[in-house]
Amino acid sequence: MPNDIAVLLPVDRPAGALIDCAAAVAGLFEAHLDGIACAYQALNPMIAFEASAVVMAAQYETGQEQAAVVLDQFEITARRLNIPHDAKSTFNVSYAATRTVTEMSRLYDLNIVAQPDSSNPSQTDFLAEAILFGSGRPMLMIP
């Protein structure tokens, strides 16, 4: 029976259904739920060195704002359902993101992620595959 559940929340597409499902699973098992908003920087600063400072700062602020919105939505749902929870955000460059997410997912009894949608590509489409093959922990994929 899972005691600690993580839901990895995409910041660049709607996460309401994912949050609702994760809250329902956590409520079913009376588990602690961590909402982790994953914002990623697509630009590699070593490729576009001249413009990297300005672009990276803009991407960072946009990613943090999007993460804050998703985490607020998560907190409202978890409080409404009386689920013990924490909310976190992670912001990383794309080449280190897989390692970061995999290491974080190893700490939980169950990881809940959104299923990638090929008709609507997202920056976080790699999450499901990274957790499935890298964490060694159970994963629930929500369409």
Model-assigned labels for residue ranges:
Residues 1-56, 134-137:
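Small/aliphatic-rich secondary-structure junction motif
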Residues 76-111:
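Structural beta-alpha unit
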Residues 11, 87-93, 117-120:
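Short, flexible loop segments at the rims of nucleotide/cofactor-binding pockets, characterized by
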